[in-house]
């Protein structure tokens, strides 16, 4: 990770960002490259969970946020509004990072009840994602750690905390 300052994400749309970027100059004969792994977190989630509907959306090169919006808001794909797509994007990435109904409600300026319904509909749409995430929480609680795609163990000591909020955090990071 890169922070204070985050040199991995220097703004390009602001004049100050453009000025800062000018100080990075490659050695003679070399170039800098830029790689954007489009929706990499969601693609990995599709692979790890084995959710057929999510995998199919990627195989067919569909707009995953519009596809999710269509499913979650029960509207035909061609009728998904920009707001619905934006909200679905927040749900898609929020799920990956363990967002709660409270967190989603804050992000989208909606009620907790609505946010909870969005999350529930997401898991109805992509049930294997729910099973996969639940299995990670179960593993974390039983073993005190979860295992990454490459076999790295990530300890989650929060599961043993007497503090409810800490245990909830453990579930989100699992």
Specify the residue positions occupied by each region the protein language model found.
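Acidic, glycine-rich two-metal-ion catalytic cores of nucleic acid-processing enzymes
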Residues: 1-79, 139-174
